[in-house]
Each structure stands twice: as C-alpha cells, then as structure tokens.
Amino acid sequence: INGGLLFGLNMAGISGAVDMIKGEFSLTDSGLGTVAALLTFGCLIGALFTGTFTEKFGRKKVMIITAVLYIISAFGCALAESATMLVVFRVLSGLAVGATSVVAPMYISEIAPAHSRGRLVSLNQFAITIGIVLAYIFDYLLIGFGYNAWRYMLAVPGFFGVLFLLFLIVKFPESPRWLLAHARRDEAVKVLNSIGGNALVTEELPAMESTLIAEQKKDK
C-alpha cells in the first residue's frame, strides 16, 4: 500500500508546483514540459528492467532500493539548484515509480493467501489513486508557504519513502516463491508460517513448488 501511495504522490505531486518551477528556473513551456514528462521516461526504464532484478536479487531487496530511490529523488528535487538537477532527480523518481508498478503487484500476489490475493492487489491500485488525491491535498496546503512552496511539495514523497523503507526493513519478509526458486525452502516455510500458520504452509507450498517445477521444465 505504501508503494501505491508513493506511486500516486510522485505522479501528481508536481502539478501544483509547475508555475513556480517555471519561474524559478526561467523555463520555456517546452522546457517545463520536459521536466514534467521525464518522470515517464524513468518509469519506462524502471518497468523494463525491474523484472530481471527481482528474479536475481529478490522482491524485498528491490523494494528497499525503490524506497531509497523515492527518498533520494524527492529530496533531490526539493533541493535542486538548477533545471538540470531537477531533471536528473525526476528521472530517478520515474525509475522508482516504474519499478513499483512491477514489483508491488508481484510481491503481493506471491505473499498473500489465495483468498485475499485479489483484494490486496486491488487495494494496491486503490492506494495509487489515494496517493494522487493526497498529492493534490498537500499541494493545496503548501501553496501558501511562499516562494519555495514548490520545494516542499516535491519533498512530500520523501517522507512517505522513509516510512516505506522502515516498514520494509522491519515488517516485510521476502517472497516465499522467490525463496523456493532459489533453493531456500526452509526460509519459505518460515515466511508462510508467519503469515498464516501451518494451514497456509500446507495450502500454498505444494502449489508453489509444482508451479516452479512446471516453469523450469518449460524453460528447458
């Protein structure tokens, strides 16, 4: 859910800041459009390569990296002293958004019990919408902070990123499916047991193992 909120906050957070950014860096309309649109370019790159990284390093590690990118990009945008700096951090923000669009649904589908999987994936999508709404609310509340209000607007996702990172480190286990795929069965059992007890282990583990075996045969 945190990932969805950050997705929405980063997509919409700049909307209330565009006029101030244009004045701050004396941008033309096309230059301002480039600054705003480059987040989408970062999204494309992030979405393209995240799948490979999640298979190699694990879902949790990629989400931690994504949370760090959210923090760096948000505070980097807020502290930008030039349009070039702003562009660089906007692209980083896009990388995080693109990565989240891939890894968050993947993680939820692999760790949630079957009976609640669809609901949780839908909740992640709903969180994106909530993030967009929150971005507009924060922009409205911060508009009165004067000349540097745009910096505060762009910093907002950074604070949510810190919370996301703390939750990831403390609360979120690795995907049991990824653990199984990397010959770490005992750890996968522990994760499933911590989520739903022995009943979930009995229900999910055989299905995961049979799916992985089928995929390995297909790859051959």
Q: What are these regions, as identified by a protein language model?
A:
Residues 1-220:
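Transmembrane-helix signature of 12-pass secondary carriers
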